[in-house]
A protein has these predicted regions:
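Conserved PLP-anchoring active-site segment centered on the Schiff-base-forming lysine
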Residues: 95-116
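Phosphate-binding glycine-rich loop
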Residues: 62-102, 300
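Conserved PLP-binding catalytic core of the aspartate aminotransferase-like
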Residues: 268, 281-313
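PLP-dependent aminotransferase class I/II
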Residues: 200-280, 284-287
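PLP-dependent enzyme catalytic core of the Aspartate aminotransferase-like
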Residues: 163, 309-318, 322-351
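Active-site phosphate-binding strand-loop segment of PLP-dependent enzymes
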Residues: 125, 130-185
Length: 351
């Protein structure tokens, strides 16, 4: 080993869902929205003055922060915006989890959590889900250095009711509690209003799922003005200009089109419920997802076999080799046509 190699920070990186390099695939593996952004977003993109590219974007992201704050009934100083919710969450780990006590999060959850904890040298302890794959609030009563969990959880899709979320917060008033709501729009009640009751709570959301803008990388957090200031202080210590002007303008256009947003979410949730019925007929079982995906296992055919056979048909779903969930597939909800093709393929595979 070379001498300088001992100074390299080594981590096990996050592995994203496969991005197919071929055309004509049915892509149901990364929980993207099957429908494009609203017409308002297209118009905003066309209206962008190319001459503005020579200028730095607004470091405070003022227009987008105000639009998000107005939409959700928050003050501007209660909103933080970042380059996708991954950026926001990473900043949260770096900003708020700096003690010697272990940060708590579920053992089956968004796998980026352990990556960030390892990267930033944060001690952590994973809490097991129960036999029904549910988060157990009582497991988060113990002494800790912070708490984070998704709601709905990923990859299970299970939603925790707001009373249970509040219960976890009530037992953790001395640390920062982060509720990751990437999928909340598909069937849950947001915990966002709790930031007005608890000054230690952050609620993180994204434009990537319900607003069809994964490619523009827009995430945001709600919290007390003290928490938001702390996040901005850390952000400006890395990069003053995290959001590009295109994302800012298109984000404003998206958040202001409530009608399209609601129609799009309604279409996806209707397709999800129909897909659940069809999967059940084929012998699949799954938690009752309230997200834009279904986490399914088959009674007799191994998940990896199904995954590989679907891939041969250019249908991409997500397979996890992680113990405990290595016989499950996470299936993103696509268009009705895409899901019909998936069901047809599955009927041939599982027979």
């Amino acid at each position: 080993m070379k001498a300088w190699e001992s100074n390299i920070r080594k981590v096990e990186p996050y592995v994203p869902g496969e991005q197919p390099k071929v055309q004509d695939v049915i892509k149901l593996n990364t929980n993207e929205n099957p429908y494009g952004p609203s017409e308002n977003v297209r118009k905003a993109m066309e209206a962008i003055d190319i001459d503005r590219c020579r200028l730095y974007p607004d470091p405070d992201v003022t227009k987008l922060v105000k639009s998000i704050a107005d939409y959700y009934g928050m003050d501007n100083n209660q909103v933080f915006v970042g380059v996708g919710s991954d950026d926001v969450l990473s900043m949260c780990f770096l900003t708020f989890f700096n003690g010697k006590k272990q940060v708590l999060f579920p053992d089956i959850t968004y796998s980026f959590y352990s990556v960030w904890a390892d990267l930033y040298r944060i001690p952590y302890e994973k809490q097991k889900l129960d036999d029904n794959m549910k988060i157990v609030p009582e497991d988060y009563y113990k002494e800790n250095g912070g708490v984070i969990f998704p709601n709905p959880n990923a990859p299970t899709g299970l939603l925790m009711d707001l009373d249970s979320v509040r219960d976890i917060i009530e037992h953790n008033k001395d640390v920062v509690v982060i509720v990751d709501e990437a999928y909340i729009d598909f069937g849950g009640v947001s915990a966002k209003d709790l930031v007005n009751e608890y000054d230690n709570v952050l609620v993180v959301q994204t434009f990537s799922k319900s607003r069809s803008m994964a490619g523009m990388r827009i995430g945001y957090a709600f919290g007390s003005k003290e928490l938001i200031k702390a996040l901005n202080d850390v952000k400006f210590s890395f990069n003053s200009y995290t959001m590009n002007m295109t994302s800012i303008d298109m984000g404003v256009a998206s958040i202001n089109d409530k009608k399209y947003f609601e129609e799009c979410v309604e279409r996806i949730t209707a397709t999800r419920e129909r897909t659940k019925e069809e999967l059940t007929k084929l012998g699949f079982t799954f938690p009752d997802s309230k997200a834009n995906f279904i986490f399914a296992t088959h009674k007799s055919v191994p998940a990896k076999e199904i995954f590989e056979k679907l891939k041969d048909l250019n249908i991409f779903v997500r397979y996890f080799a992680q113990p405990g969930i290595d016989n499950y597939l996470r299936i993103t909800i696509g268009t009705d046509e895409q899901m019909d093709k998936l069901i047809s393929a599955l009927s041939e595979i599982v027979g």
